[in-house]
Amino acid sequence: MTLEPGTTIEDTRRLESGMTRREIVALFKRRQEAYEDLDAKTLAGDYTDASVIESPSAGVHTGRDAEKALGAIFDAFLDLTMTVDDLVIDGDVVVAILSFEGTHMRPLLGFEPTGKRFHLSGAFVHRLKDRKIIHERRVYDFTGLLVQIGVLKAKPA
């Protein structure tokens, strides 16, 4: 087998997900672009009907219902940006270390827009199978986001 420069055997080995490491990296690059385009439909297309998505802000969703939850976030933060700071791939488990920024421009979960910006870091833990995300656990400080956009007050420590 001839490899492109900079490519390792590990990059080309298919995992249980049916994907190579290189394909997994491409999937998450495409997901980052979909976040930047506020494209909930493309993001939801990476899930199966039985996928489980757990989120501090939206609760637990099954399947492509995640599109509705993402749509609500995208509607509230029209300038939302997401950056993949690091991607850790261990077999069919992928952890994306992420940074988010945006401005609260429209209602969110019943809170009127404040016009305030937020910056948030977090990690999304994904399990892949058959080229799809079958489980996603989002870990981030949702309370901190609410404080930053001014809809929740916090007392100094």
Task: For every predicted segment, state its role.
Residues 10, 48, 103-106, 113, ...:
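Residue-level signal for pocket-adjacent positions within structured domains
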Residues 1-49, 60, 154-157:
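Short, low-complexity N-terminal intrinsically disordered segments enriched in polar/charged residues
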Residues 63-66, 117, 154-157:
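Juxtamembrane/interface motifs at transmembrane-helix termini
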Residues 2-5, 95, 119-149:
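Short beta-strand edge/turn micro-motifs at domain boundaries
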Residues 39, 81, 132, 150:
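Conserved functional loop/turn residues at catalytic and ligand-binding sites
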Residues 21-25, 29, 40-94, 98-101:
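A solvent-exposed, acidic/Ser-Thr-rich amphipathic alpha-helical stretch
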